[in-house]
Amino acid sequence: MKISYNWLKNYVDFNLTPNDLGEVLTGVGLEVEDIVPFETIQGGLEGVLIGEVKECAKHPDADKLSVTKVDVGSGELLQIVCGAPNVAAGQKVVVALVGSTLYPSVGEKLAIKKAKIRGVESFGMICAEDEIGLSESHAGIMVLDASAIVGTKAADFFKVEKDYVLEIGLTPNRGDANSHIGVARDLATALNVAYKAKVNFTKPAVQSSIFNLQSSIIKVEVQDNEACPRYSAISISNVTVADSPDWLKNKLKAIGVRSVNNVVDITNFVLHEYGQPLHAFDADKIGTEKVVVKKLAQGTVFKTLDEKEVKLCKDDLMICNGDEPMCIAGVFGGLNSGVTAATKNIFLESAYFSSTSIRKTATRLNLRTDAAMHFEKGTDPNITVDALKRAALLITEICGGEVSSEIIDLYPNKIEGWRLSVSFDRMIRLAGFFIPNDTVSKILEHLEIKIEKENGDEWDLLIPAFKTDVKREADVVEEILRIYGYNSFTLPKHLKSSLPVYDKIDVQKTENTIAELLSGAGFIEVWTNSVTQSKFEEEETLRLQQVKLLNSQTTELDALRTSMLYSLLEVVAYNQNRRAIDLRLFEFGKTYHRLAEKKFSEKRKLVLLLCGKSSSDNWLTKGTAFDFYHLKSFVTNVLNSLGHYTFEKEVSELHPYNFNLIFKTEEIEVARIGSIAKSTLKKFDIKNDVFYAEINWDYLLEKSQFAKTSFVELPKFPSVSRDLAMVLNEEINFDSIEKIAITESKKLLQEISLFDLYKGDKIEKGKKSYAVNFVFQHPEKTLTDIEIEKIMNRLMSKYESDLGAVIRKN
């Protein structure tokens, strides 16, 4: 959200620098992410002066160039070569001096330098309107009125205004601050309470006798009061639609809003002032003289303001002139009802629409307008008339015309806010430090939270309707703390803490731990839809377990997922279509299974996916493509970090995997990993190899060593390392070697790793050579060579007898 520093001063009489203002707003929860200088003409016309052409002669070596002598008030005439056909002696002109920089309306910035043009030196530039960013006109140089004073700074002549724009990262729950007045309310509260500055918070005056009419030609009917709890409107006649005055254009330009015309600009101005969206209709196009707020039949076609046709659904709220739709309520206007240069009479709407209704329509139609986003965050139902009056006063002032109807205000069920009983003592305990009673009262008063009754420790509060995020006592405490200031209390010199031991695992904490582990390895967490297409599932057993939806919103998304693979493949396809090929993804989620008639189960899973390269190409080396072993190492790290050791079993032809591995403990499947079959990838139009792992998260949580926290003293005695090489049958896996080592080492084995694998001509066909490293350590003494040799001899004997290994000795 963009907030103008100068604009904010219209409501709060503060005296802060932009940086200080940013610190205050950030302190009250409106995080200022950036502060950007703004000028109504980019660059502020620094180094640009008003001059007078004293002499003008043809260039000796170019027919289309002129050599001029220009007075800019410095006491010396500047020689400037000019290519404009309309340059002449006696003109007052805009001159850019050497060293200045211009920002044209179109194109790149232009640095003015001393130049020699066809042999004639030039010391500056006589400017056209587009060259200084004033307009897009390039019909020769800009000739000023004869009254212009030579030597005047162009910035002063054109009344260039300077401002600062604060970029605020507004959180979704703060719809009340989604406007200049909303920010001003928080600012004034903080300055008055935390900074004791005694500033005034002033809203625009909207009372006027022009609103005393008692009739209206255009009538309004609201057929759905749930989707539209309040609808306010007014008619204004004999307006002149034209360009907006500079002050209005500049206000909107500062916050990144394009000027359209005076009527539309006023509605946008009030939107960003109050946070209340408005819509102006051409009243003469409302043929029935009746506006109806209702929903239309499924499949109704509507042409929007940008000349695109959309198909409506039965839940889309529309503004109609009888039966014909004119506007998608709160989202987007229609082509045939908007204000144009020919408009003379307008019907101005200011309504309160349900945020849920607007969100569904805007999302389905992919129309993310400013109005829709304000309604989605939540607007104030009790300011529709004030915003309407503000806009009407500005329209009659700027566009001419007069108010020609009463204010229509359909508000059958007034939304006054909600009542909340809180305990002052409990709030102080929750805050963690004492805040005086009168300070709390003052904060609530400035935030427009009314204290209706104080009965000792108990307070009865009336929360205003615009405070949609204040629903409980803890929310009130948050409001108090953010204004009082989290930096207003001092930390004690000593902090005491304990290291708790948990008998029961903290699921969320464990997920966060693993998420941090994977994020540190370059993975990105995704959330995918648990509703999927039943046709995706290829495994027969899982297909029989599918849970079909009875009332699916679409014909394709018709079942709950039995595997998380296919939703992740959709993510891969989406990213690859946007040239994001190299992916490391993970997701915590659930799969859903039908066990029998009316019997279902949910299974928690952690899934990992790799695609593309593990590192990008550079001048020195080519990037390495992900393979099965990359994924295996990541899965192993996850299991080990939970203190869970598994044994591997290779499995073949398990669709949709090409080559896969299952990690098992006590015959329970802990994880399965593999590469996805080309036939499956083809259905998603994925051309790169994809490696996928699915981890039984329920089982890991149940067996995780995080469940019981224990503290172990760091080892005092050194570890001992030994290497062993052996030749084995090709079908024997490393997990068999690891299992024997763990069993035979009597808890002295700390680590076992495979550091070399050989298959080739130097050993018998059907055989392979493993080189394995063992690390041993005793918790209470230093192991002797004799003890190590006993362990190694026992291991070698076991490998020979159980695995048929041939030990390779030096």
Give the residues covered by each predicted segment:
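Extended, well-folded interaction surfaces typified by the phenylalanyl-tRNA synthetase beta subunit core
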Residues: 420-424, 428-581, 722, 775-777, ...
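Phosphate-backbone binding interfaces of nucleic-acid-interacting proteins
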Residues: 1-214, 347, 366, 370, ...
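Conserved mixed alpha/beta core segments that line enzyme active sites in large multi-domain catalysts
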Residues: 49-80, 151, 261, 267-336
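Glycine/proline-enriched, intrinsically flexible loops and inter-domain linkers
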Residues: 5, 23, 28, 38-40, ...
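Mobile "lid/hinge" segments at catalytic clefts and subdomain interfaces of large enzymes
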Residues: 118-133, 140-143, 154-164, 317-416, ...
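Terminal amphipathic helices with adjacent charged low-complexity linkers/tails
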Residues: 187, 191-208, 216-222, 399-427, ...
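Class II aminoacyl-tRNA synthetase-like tRNA-binding/catalytic domains
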Residues: 91, 115, 292-332, 336-339, ...
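A carboxyl-terminal module marker
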Residues: 2, 446-449, 599, 615-810
